[in-house]
């Protein structure tokens, strides 16, 4: 089974578990690292997810995966269920919507105004662009970024 098929299968299995508890899925990864396979499921809820809640979801998902025949993941793997963390990636539209007003890090495919990386407060989100309020030494300014230029974005911790 391809990694994308595993992600799709796991997403379909975990969503009802999360919905029952008013949690939401932020990401699913199935990756090979250092000779081992890892199935990572990132979950959250308003106010933040707890370790006990991650354990509960892990056990429920593991039970569902074990009950499937044929096994959707024939190779051995480690199942990890966790919070996406303080610097969580912004991958979906809802991630960006929830990040309005938050400090974020944006990496671009190509330079914009001589830079490929911007950090600032997400001020405005439009379908084709976003606006960051950026601090540059002693001044603040709004930087408009075309969303097609964005290679990756994540929440960031402001220092």
UniProtKB/Swiss-Prot annotation:
<dbReference type="InterPro" id="IPR035956">
    <property type="entry name" value="RimP_N_sf"/>
</dbReference>
<dbReference type="InterPro" id="IPR036847">
    <property type="entry name" value="RimP_C_sf"/>
</dbReference>
<keyword id="KW-0690">Ribosome biogenesis</keyword>
<protein>
    <recommendedName>
        <fullName>Ribosome maturation factor RimP</fullName>
    </recommendedName>
</protein>
<dbReference type="GO" id="GO:0006412">
    <property type="term" value="P:translation"/>
</dbReference>
<dbReference type="InterPro" id="IPR028998">
    <property type="entry name" value="RimP_C"/>
</dbReference>
<dbReference type="Pfam" id="PF17384">
    <property type="entry name" value="DUF150_C"/>
</dbReference>
<keyword id="KW-0963">Cytoplasm</keyword>
<dbReference type="GO" id="GO:0005829">
    <property type="term" value="C:cytosol"/>
</dbReference>
<dbReference type="InterPro" id="IPR028989">
    <property type="entry name" value="RimP_N"/>
</dbReference>
<dbReference type="GO" id="GO:0000028">
    <property type="term" value="P:ribosomal small subunit assembly"/>
</dbReference>
<comment type="similarity">
    <text>Belongs to the RimP family.</text>
</comment>
<dbReference type="InterPro" id="IPR003728">
    <property type="entry name" value="Ribosome_maturation_RimP"/>
</dbReference>
<dbReference type="Pfam" id="PF02576">
    <property type="entry name" value="RimP_N"/>
</dbReference>
<comment type="function">
    <text>Required for maturation of 30S ribosomal subunits.</text>
</comment>
């Amino acid at each position: 089974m391809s990694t994308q098929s595993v992600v799709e299968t796991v997403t379909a299995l975990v969503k009802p578990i999360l919905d029952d508890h008013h949690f939401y899925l932020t990401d699913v990864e199935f990756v090979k690292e250092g000779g081992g396979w890892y199935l990572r499921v990132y979950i959250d809820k308003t106010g933040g997810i707890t370790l006990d809640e991650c354990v509960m979801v892990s056990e429920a998902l593991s039970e569902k995966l074990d009950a499937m025949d044929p096994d959707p993941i024939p190779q051995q793997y480690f199942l990890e269920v966790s919070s996406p963390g303080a610097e969580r990636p912004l991958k979906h539209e809802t991630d960006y919507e929830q990040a309005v007003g938050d400090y974020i890090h944006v990496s671009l495919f190509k330079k914009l105004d001589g830079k490929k990386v911007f950090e600032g407060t997400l001020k405005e989100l439009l379908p084709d662009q976003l606006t960051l309020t950026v601090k540059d030494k002693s001044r603040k300014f709004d930087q408009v970024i075309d969303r097609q230029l964005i290679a990756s974005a994540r929440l960031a911790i402001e220092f």
